[in-house]
Design a protein with these regions (language model features):
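Formylglycine-dependent sulfatase
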Residues: 1-197
């Protein structure tokens, strides 16, 4: 999940990058001798680098809830991983860092994996983000057939509306723009490139 904020030149840009299963030394700027991360290294050199931090949880949903709200996951009711069949998510009444930055005039965007609820009321655009482009949960999950599909949805790898509705295939994590599914399954080969364009 990436968070991007921008305002006047006198106000700093804010970019928060959260990666699943990343170790402390998996980036060049934190000492990795093997993994090359020149763009992130440059951002760390030109910006602020945090060296003492703790994850709010060991799995996706609660760690993301903690990062965005500044609260323990148990306090905001997100104790375990959410699945496509779940009808819950991060409570829209929780105040997120995106809400706080937006109140200060920042433009906000969430790009990448969300995993805090896929129903409209839980998506990033209901949590302080102006826009969202990404996958609503883990790459190995499927699609919730109750979600709205874009009129111009791109169906790939032999996927049809019929087998989506009948849950014939797994690993159909969709790509979303704001509150609509725009591609199913998300093209994992081009996803990173599209996130950064």
């Amino acid at each position: 999940m990436n968070f991007v904020g921008a305002q006047a030149a006198s106000t700093p840009n804010v970019i928060i990058i959260m990666a699943d299963d990343q170790g402390y030394q998996d980036l060049g700027c934190f000492g990795s001798p093997k993994i090359k991360t020149p763009q992130i290294d440059r951002m760390a050199k030109e910006g602020m680098r945090f060296t003492d931090f703790y994850s709010g949880a060991s799995v996706c949903t609660p760690s993301r809830a903690s990062l965005l709200t500044g609260c323990y996951a148990s306090r905001v009711g997100n104790l375990g991983v959410l699945f496509p069949r779940d009808k819950r998510g991060l409570n829209p009444n929780e105040i997120t860092i995106a809400d706080l930055l937006k109140a200060k005039g920042y433009a906000t965007a969430c790009i990448g994996k969300w995993h805090l609820g896929h129903l409209k009321e839980f998506l990033p655009t209901s949590q302080g983000f102006d826009t969202y482009f990404g996958v609503p949960y883990s790459n190995d999950m499927t699609i919730d057939v109750s979600q709205p599909l874009a009129n111009d949805i791109v169906l790939r790898e032999g996927v049809t509306l019929e087998n989506i509705k009948n849950r014939v295939k797994k690993n159909l994590v969709p790509l979303m723009r704001d509150t609509e599914i725009i591609e199913s399954p998300a093209d994992q080969n081009t996803l990173t490139k599209r996130y950064t364009e």
